């Protein structure tokens, strides 16, 4: 490990040690926690499972018929000095049918064990730190295609690393009007990928403006940067502390970086810009959100408009209603800042600068793909972000090389509520037109294949299923050209209880 990465590791360990030292001198109070165990059976009219039966479920479900088991425990509490702590461990495994040319499991395996959660967290006032593997919460009651974040949807497993983040902090010069929050973290991508042991940096800053009583605007920028690792073509990539600083500011690479990284930015950078408006009243909330992807400066500068995920969500605060949540999403990613990424210099430009033969115009953003980090924005064969972007089939080495379909037009609608005020349910249906990629070589997408996927899920209440038992049923169906026409069912049995103090 290079000195720069040693520095990062020491910094993370030191930060955790400071928190732990504070914990050990005080007695915990307000402790809570529990354990859970689940078994799930997954059936289908074909070998493959319908899209929504395995999508946005933490990356642990197989994509062919089979069974899944998982279990774990977690806990949290607060010490007398105000420091909070949390911990969790979760394991999962499945046995599923072998894949075929038409359907296959993303990781290429029919039997697999996984670590879903393994973390320790500590917090103080508005700050929180988590170290390990921890799933993030999703927004919009499970009805959205993205869960409220098109770059991090919950479709893949979580990454190992550390995350330092804050709750909303009021600006001292504009209290009750302006507040902000941030994310900062570093992770490792340890799956079988093109650039082995790729490092991952994340930083995000969001702000919130209280326009009037009940009307709030939220905006922000979230950046993810893949860097370091070992390329099969270029060898070990720069990953010193100086290189880490370059990655943080999206600076160009120094000596030892590839020619492309020296001209552009070191590593593979992508992210999203968030524009959101919430109107909240005593009984309900209405949200409109525009989630914009970017791969370079053209996207950050809104050159890729109208690309993005547009979400309209209406939610009653009373969740015991027959209908408590309604959602409608329109997804458009066809433009990608234009049809050309660069152009040759004109004769006049060559006279002024003979060494500059190519000019970047910023098009062909090619979302979730990269020329050097060829696995792109995938993890264990699954798309990390918007799951309607279809990942490439694994090559002969078992490596996923990005996504093959990132130019789409899609609609998604969802409803959630409680039947008879007792049985929670969700219904969603998704329709997409798929255009592949710019300058694609796969003729399959020339015909613009269409796809419809639907889901109906419900959970029996404890008073019906038993005090410590959960019974959940899911019905799913696919119709179209992207996935085989199938209907599927999942039955989930769960047990759990709280720890006794």
Predicted region positions:
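Outer-membrane beta-barrel pore domains
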Residues: 261-501
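Beta-barrel outer-membrane channel/assembly domains of diderm bacteria
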Residues: 25-136, 143, 150-152, 158-170, ...
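Internal, well-ordered domain-core segments that constitute the primary functional module
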Residues: 137-236
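Short loop/turn motifs that connect adjacent beta-strands in outer-membrane beta-barrel proteins
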Residues: 29-34, 74-88, 123-126, 169-181, ...
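Bacterial Sec-dependent N-terminal signal peptides
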Residues: 1-32, 498-501
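Transmembrane beta-strands of outer-membrane beta-barrel pores
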Residues: 39-47, 91-97, 103-105, 124-126, ...
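A conserved mid-domain beta-alpha-beta active-site/ligand-binding segment of alpha/beta enzyme cores
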Residues: 189, 216-276
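Outer-membrane beta-barrel translocator domains and adjoining extracellular loop/strand segments
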Residues: 47-54, 98-104, 111, 141-148, ...
């Amino acid at each position: 490990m290079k000195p720069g990465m040693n520095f990062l590791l020491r910094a993370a360990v030191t930060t955790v040690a400071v928190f732990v030292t504070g914990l050990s001198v005080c007695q915990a109070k307000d402790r809570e926690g529990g354990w859970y165990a689940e078994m799930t059976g997954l059936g289908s009219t074909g070998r493959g499972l319908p899209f929504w039966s395995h999508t946005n479920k933490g990356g642990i479900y197989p994509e062919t018929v089979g069974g899944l088991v998982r279990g774990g425990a977690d806990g949290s509490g607060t010490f007398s000095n105000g420091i909070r702590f949390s911990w969790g461990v979760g394991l999962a495994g499945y046995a599923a049918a072998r894949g075929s040319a038409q359907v296959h499991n993303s990781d290429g395996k029919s039997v697999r064990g996984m670590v879903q959660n393994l973390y320790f967290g500590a917090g103080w006032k508005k700050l929180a730190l988590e170290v390990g593997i921890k799933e993030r919460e999703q927004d919009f009651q499970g009805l959205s295609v993205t869960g409220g974040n098109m770059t991090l949807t919950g479709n893949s497993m979580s990454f190992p690393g550390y995350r330092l983040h804050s709750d909303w902090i009021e600006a001292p010069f504009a209290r009750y009007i302006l507040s902000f929050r941030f994310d900062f973290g570093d992770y490792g991508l340890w799956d079988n990928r093109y650039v082995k042991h790729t490092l991952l940096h994340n930083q995000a800053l969001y702000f919130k403006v209280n326009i009037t009583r009940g009307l709030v605007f939220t905006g922000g920028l979230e950046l993810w940067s893949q860097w370091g690792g070992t390329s099969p073509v270029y060898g070990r990539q720069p990953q010193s502390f100086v290189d880490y600083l370059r990655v943080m500011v999206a600076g160009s690479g120094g000596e030892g970086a590839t020619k492309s990284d020296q001209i552009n930015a070191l590593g593979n950078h992508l992210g999203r810009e968030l524009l959101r408006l919430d109107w909240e009243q005593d009984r309900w909330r209405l949200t409109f959100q525009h989630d914009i992807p970017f791969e370079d400066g053209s996207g950050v500068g809104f050159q890729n408009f109208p690309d993005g995920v547009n979400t309209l969500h209406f939610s009653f605060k009373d969740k015991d209603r027959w209908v408590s949540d309604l959602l409608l999403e329109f997804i458009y990613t066809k433009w990608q800042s234009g049809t050309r990424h660069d152009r040759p210099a004109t004769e006049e430009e060559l006279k002024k600068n003979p060494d500059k033969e190519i000019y970047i115009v910023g098009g062909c953003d090619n979302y979730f793909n990269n020329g050097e980090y060829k696995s792109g924005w995938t993890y264990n064969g699954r798309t990390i972000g918007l799951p309607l972007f279809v990942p490439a089939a694994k090559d002969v080495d078992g490596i996923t090389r990005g996504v093959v379909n990132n130019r789409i037009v899609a609609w998604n609608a969802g409803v959630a509520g409680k039947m008879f005020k007792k049985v929670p349910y969700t219904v969603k249906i998704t329709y997409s037109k798929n255009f592949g990629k710019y300058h694609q070589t796969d003729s399959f997408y020339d015909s613009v294949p269409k796809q419809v996927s639907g889901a109906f899920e419900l959970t029996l209440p404890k008073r019906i299923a038993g005090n410590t038992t959960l019974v959940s049923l899911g019905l799913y169906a696919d119709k179209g050209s992207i996935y085989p026409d199938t209907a599927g069912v999942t039955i989930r049995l769960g047990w759990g209880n709280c720890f006794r103090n």
